[in-house]
């Protein structure tokens, strides 16, 4: 095991001591919660977080490109469904039934979407 001397801020020192004190209060043994062991554990954890962030940066996933593609597919689907609804509303099998008139179908869809959106994105009083 390598030995390293380093300087840390007073804030970091106090936070490490707080972790040690908390573990001791929880019943940990003195040798298991030394300053050296705790600082080493935090350093290793920090290195893993750093490596994970670097891997994410190198990944081929591009959030902006994904969002663009997703929006494009949603718009295509919306346009296609609107055309299908228009065609369906002209069908002789449903003619005269107000439930299947295009404007009524559109309004019904908007109401249902509004209810579902409200579940996930409640309106604020500010809006």
From Swiss-Prot:
Family statement drawn from the similarity comment of this UniProt entry: Belongs to the relaxosome TraM family.
Protein name from the UniProt record: Relaxosome protein TraM
UniProt main location, coarse: cytoplasm
UniProt source species: Escherichia coli
Signal peptide from the UniProt entry: none
Coiled-coil spans in chain: none
Gene3D superfamilies linked to this entry: 1.10.287.2320, TraM protein, DNA-binding
A UniProt-annotated Pfam family: Tra_M
InterPro entries for this protein: IHF-like_DNA-bd_dom_sf, TraM_DNA-bd, TRelaxosome_TraM
Cell location: Cytoplasm
Function of the molecule: Conjugative DNA transfer (CDT) is the unidirectional transfer of ssDNA plasmid from a donor to a recipient cell. It is the central mechanism by which antibiotic resistance and virulence factors are propagated in bacterial populations. Part of the relaxosome, which facilitates a site- and strand-specific cut in the origin of transfer by TraI, at the nic site. Probably autoregulates its own expression. Plasmid specificity is conferred by the TraD-TraM pair.
UniProt entry keywords in alphabetical sequence: Conjugation, Cytoplasm, DNA-binding, Plasmid, Transcription, Transcription regulation
Source domain of life: Bacteria
